[in-house]
Amino acid sequence: MKITRITGTFPSTSGLCRCRYYMYIPENPRAAVMLSHGMCEYFQRYCGFAEFLCRNGIALVGNDHIGHGNSVSDRDMLGYFGEAGGYMYMVKDLHRMRALSLIHI
């Protein structure tokens, strides 16, 4: 089965970084899942899971949250979401990720 892999970046609502995103899309997907990884994680840990889902007709999309994975250009920023209430940037970034994925799926 052919799997289309798309990567790119979008500006985080935090203004602190550009979030790296990933999309694994099978031919004629019957469903899509958006993954939101945990603390100290990053999307690429889930490549095997993405391929499993694609083999079963399900697309997987997600991004490295602010302060995580390839969304960090300075290692001192690992785990940093921003000032008080910074977690809301992550939530808003997930909404951006959803809108972006709808263009491709």
Language model regions located:
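Short N-terminal helix/helix-N-cap motif within the alpha/beta-hydrolase-1
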Residues: F43-C47, N70
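Alpha/beta-hydrolase active-site loop
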Residues: G82-S101
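Active-site glycine-rich loops that stabilize anionic/oxyanionic intermediates
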Residues: G38-E41
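Conserved small/polar residues in nucleotide/adenosyl-binding loops
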Residues: I103-I105
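Surface-exposed, active-site-proximal loop segments in enzymatic domains
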Residues: S73-E83
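Conserved alpha/beta-hydrolase
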Residues: F52-R75
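Alpha/beta-hydrolase fold active-site loops
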Residues: R30-V33
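N-terminal cap/lid segment of alpha/beta-hydrolase-fold proteins
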Residues: M1-I25
